[in-house]
Amino acid sequence: MGRKPCCEKVGLRRGPWTSEEDQKLVSHITNNGLSCWRAIPKLAGLLRCGKSCRLRWTNYLRPDLKRGIFSEAEENLILDLHATLGNRWSRIAAQLPGRTDNEIKNYWNTRLKKRLRSQGLDPNTHLPLEDSKLDDTEDDTDDEGGDSSDVTMSDASKSEKRSKKKSKPKETVKVRQPKGPKPAPQLKMCQSDEGPVLLKVPKAPKSPISVNPGPGCNYDDDSEHSSSSTVTTKSHEDHRDSSDFIKALTSVSSFPEAELWSCIKPITNSFSSTALLSEWDSYRAFDSSLFPSSYPQLNSGLPKLEDVNSKSSAVASPVQGMLPAYNPMGMEMQTRMQFSSQLTHEIGQNYGGIFQETCYPQPDMGMSWSMHAELSHCGTESLFATPNPANAPSNFEEVPQPSPCTTSQELQRLAALLDLI
């Protein structure tokens, strides 16, 4: 904040003082003495500001002022004081009684400064000037005004300040950049004895295995925002092997799928479709013992998958909960029998579903497998067979027997389903 102004300067006079104003100011100060300069104009009846009254009294109306030319002793004193104090005219005027600072400054610029230059001395430092700088300084003095050099500080002091500024190294200010907000931890709802609990889900580690799903799969992995990943298949890739889908599904760096697959993968790689079929046939005797004695033809043994493709017989359209009875002697397919509650309890609902869906060819479903068709089928009805009501009608229809060339496709489908399980 600057200095408070001496007055509002509204309705005040400016310009040179008149003799009447000088008389009012002198009479007031001689009668009342010096006081606050802001209050003197009102007390003396002047339309002037306090600063104007102070300067008029100090420089012109003061009774102890000296008028006339400076003496030689005063000139020598001014030169000595300027060599030590510089352009501090008010302090120099304090050493010369009866002389004002403005009067001393004007006398220095008009007389004493030129005298020093004529003697070969620098007026700012009072030291001898070099011959090379003498002409330059004389040209500068001709262009300078009377009061411009008096107001500013000496060149020596300026040069000293410049050298100090250059010597000081610039301080580097470290600016702290704010960090962005941390992402919120991922939570997962888990059931416990006390109730539902929210647990933090650890960040999934990046898998070193690179996934190339190909045109049939769209792979989307966003490990920064979600711990799960999605793999979608297109239905137009009907004849694509299911192992590619399983590879893409299990190679995704998700948690806990990737950890689970790392444990299961060595076991599944050791299996082959031929070994699985041979192991399936080895359990036929055990499976036949589960059927009750009321079905003697089922106890005689279950047919093999190769025999089903080679036999030319009428196959009924499969219905959930129904198991076709096959005559091993080469006879026609017998009437479809319904599972009783005891049979369903002994054999198991899952076993009946897997046996029906995998061991017998389906006339209403194509041999080529697609994920889209499998998902659409699961949306309407269960994959596993359920027992039919006792009064369900048995409709038979004659369908063409699939050719033996489709056996390899059925084996691939069976292997893919076992891998998924």
Curated annotation (Swiss-Prot):
Coiled-coil zones: none
DNA-binding positions: 37-61, 89-112
Keywords: Activator, DNA-binding, Nucleus, Repeat, Transcription, Transcription regulation
Record flagged with keyword Endoplasmic reticulum: no
Keyword DNA-binding: yes
Chain spans, region Disordered: 119-240
TM annotation in the entry: none
Compartments where found: Nucleus
MF GO annotations: cis-regulatory region sequence-specific DNA binding
A Gene Ontology cellular-component term: nucleus
Compositional bias segments (type: Acidic residues): 136-147
Main subcellular location: nucleus
GO biological process, one term: regulation of DNA-templated transcription
Function according to Swiss-Prot or TrEMBL: Possible transcription activator.
Name used for this protein in its record: Myb-related protein Pp2
